[in-house]
Amino acid sequence: MSAYEYPRLSRSDIITALKDAQIASVTETDLKTPTSDFVSELYTRILIYLDALDEEEKGQVDFEALEQLENPDHHATSMQAMKLYCKVKDMLEMLDCPLPISFKDLLRPESSRTEFFISALLNYGLYKDSKMDLIRPKAEELGLLDEQRKQCEAKVAQLNAEIGEFDEAVERDLPFVQELEANIEQLNKKILELNNQQMSLRATFQKMREKSTQMDNEISKAEFDLVETVQENANLRSQIVQSPDKLQGALEEKKLVLGETKKAEQSAMVTFQEKAAILEVFEKALKKILKSSSQLQLINEQVTNAKTVEKEFKALKDKLSEDGVAYKSLEAKVVERERIVEQLNESLKQLEKEKAVMFDDWTKQLNELKVEVESRRRELETRQTNVESVVAMVDDNTAKTNQVRQSGEAKVKKLAAKYEEIVKQFHEYTVSFDAFLPSL
């Protein structure tokens, strides 16, 4: 027995179940006195509801099997009925239905047996719907996870593309960066040298400024001494008349002092000009240093931009690693859902194998039934031949005596009735036999 049971539903329950499932709209009269057409249509709709029969297969017949018959047009309806019977029988056998169905249940259905078979199929449908309701959230969740996996894969692909572009940009700019780093190193060395030179020049400039200040003081002092000398010279001129000899000596002494003062003044002027030239050189060097400093500032800005790009690249790598972790967790969930789907597929394959085994058993029984029908058909042919010979004998004996004729006519009528019954049975067996041929 399967996981579900076969409680016989009442007619009202069957009507309600068929209506709720939108299979068919039936009445109690239809179930109380079922007809062959009603039962065939109801079984067809139930099989379509259970996915055991496609909507397109409804009313179709096996034309290849019909071509093997002498009059295929006479067997189209019987072929459809036999095909439906095989489908219903396979389904009930798959459900381990305790009550076997026969072809008679389609041709001349009984109310109790029909209700039992419909109850079994509807119970299976309810059982299947309940299981599908349990599986449906998992399937929807699996679909959402698959969609999220696709989105993550697209996002990872986009990030990989961006990383590839960044890697290409890094490789493309690597020679320039290396050259820039070399230039920066050279400029740093040059800046260090210029800073040292600037410190040295500042110290020298400070010394020269102090020396210039000292020379200015000396020049001022020399000018002051010159003024005093001029005043003394004027005094000496006024005193020449009074003491020329003494004045001449003092004058010569003053001339010597004045000569030394002029020499000191000339020397101070030369030193001042040299200091001015050195100061001009310092100013030019300072301008060059300022220009180099501006270039260095631009280079530092480029280096800062390169470092910013590198930080962004590292941030993208970290983000990619986080997305990779999320993707791995999502992939683990997808693997788990795929494992569940594989288990369901394995269960479905097992059911299909069991169905194939049942179908083989049914085919074997059908072959045996075919042999039996063939033997009965031959027996009926023999009987028909015998009947024809008897009729001929009766016709011959009719001319002899009226009594024999009357008894012969009665016997012929009796044999004719029996013959019609035999022909009718023969026709039913022929229809059944022809209906089994497509599945061979």
From Swiss-Prot:
Coiled coil: 142-239, 299-386
Principal subcellular localisation of the protein: nucleus
GO-annotated biological processes: cell division; endosperm cellularization; mitotic sister chromatid segregation; mitotic spindle organization
Any one GO MF annotation of this record: microtubule binding
Subcellular location: Chromosome, Centromere
Superkingdom to which the source organism belongs: Eukaryota
Function (record text): Acts as a component of the essential kinetochore-associated NDC80 complex, which is required for chromosome segregation and spindle checkpoint activity to ensure proper cell division.
Subunit structure, interactors included: Component of the NDC80 complex, which consists of NDC80, NUF2, SPC24 and SPC25.
Listed name of the protein: Kinetochore protein NUF2 homolog
Species of origin: Arabidopsis thaliana
Record gene name: NUF2
